[in-house]
């Protein structure tokens, strides 16, 4: 009998796509909120505009799996390149929200990766991508409000690196300057800024380097067998995948060899 799929129906975290860094979007978003104020409506304005990509029920010791899942998505981000469209202001329960289109494939894939890594992701109810504008004390009818914005979602757009980020946020976290305080935040342009300095791992690293790299990382990050560790590092180095970036961030020795382009043993 197949195992029953677990859902995050009592979530404690979510994957967040923040929007406060996009000035074009924010100009229209704040104008929409000002209309609510001018109409004299009693509501709580959203101070950290965002799109929730998926909900999670996880523990703090699973943060690394979440980070690796996000990094794995970034390795294939070209598959999701296009535009995110915000339009059709309407009520969803007690909230005034914008419809959001363009994150559908990203949602499906990140949920799949998170589940493979042992994280409880997504909810049993249908995921409805939206961006909250304001919350009311009770359900209301809001008519005749207009909004449309088309946001480029690319690693690089017109020779400018993206401002997009994917973040892990604990539910109930505080908000500062339009952003949630996050447990981790990964810049979507990170992959373009991390490039292995040589075509092959063996061009600058030797087997003698493995133990020094392993010593900089957490227990279990690399296989204990040196040949297996070498094969894993070589694979990710030559493909510039998420584990290369993780080791580069966390191993001082690894960074020195990459910078010097030569083994330091």
UniProtKB/Swiss-Prot annotation:
Domain of life, per UniProt, equals Viruses
Please give the positions of the paired cysteines in each disulfide bond: none
One Pfam family in the UniProt entry: Corona_NS2A
Q: Which family does it belong to?
A: Belongs to the coronaviruses ns2a protein family.
Q: What is this protein called?
A: Non-structural protein 2a
Query: What species is this protein from?
Result: Rat coronavirus (strain 681)
What lineage does UniProt assign to this protein's organism?
Answer: Viruses, Riboviria, Orthornavirae, Pisuviricota, Pisoniviricetes
């Amino acid at each position: 009998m197949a195992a029953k799929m677990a859902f995050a129906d009592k979530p404690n975290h979510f994957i967040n796509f923040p929007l406060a860094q996009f000035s074009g979007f924010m100009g229209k978003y704040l104008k929409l909120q000002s209309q609510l104020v001018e109409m004299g409506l009693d509501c709580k304005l959203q101070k950290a505009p965002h799109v929730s990509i998926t909900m999670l029920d996880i523990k703090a010791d699973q943060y690394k799996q979440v980070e690796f899942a996000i990094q794995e998505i970034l390795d294939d981000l070209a598959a999701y390149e296009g535009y995110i469209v915000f339009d059709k202001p309407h009520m969803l329960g007690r909230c005034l929200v914008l419809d959001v289109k363009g994150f559908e494939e990203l949602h499906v894939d990140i949920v799949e990766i998170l589940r493979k890594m042992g994280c409880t992701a997504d909810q049993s109810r249908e995921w409805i991508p939206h961006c909250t504008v304001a919350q009311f004390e009770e359900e209301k009818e809001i008519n005749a409000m207009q909004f449309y914005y088309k946001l480029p979602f690319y690693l690089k757009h017109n020779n400018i690196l993206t401002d997009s980020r994917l973040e892990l946020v604990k539910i109930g976290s505080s908000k500062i300057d339009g952003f949630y305080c996050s447990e981790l935040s990964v810049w979507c342009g990170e992959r373009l800024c991390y490039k292995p300095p040589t075509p092959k791992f063996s061009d600058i690293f030797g087997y003698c380097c493995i133990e020094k790299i392993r010593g900089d990382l957490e227990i279990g990050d690399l296989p204990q067998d040196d040949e297996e560790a070498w094969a894993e590092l070589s694979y990710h180095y030559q493909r510039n995948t998420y584990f290369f970036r993780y080791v580069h961030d966390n191993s001082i020795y690894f960074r020195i060899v990459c910078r010097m382009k030569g083994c330091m043993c």
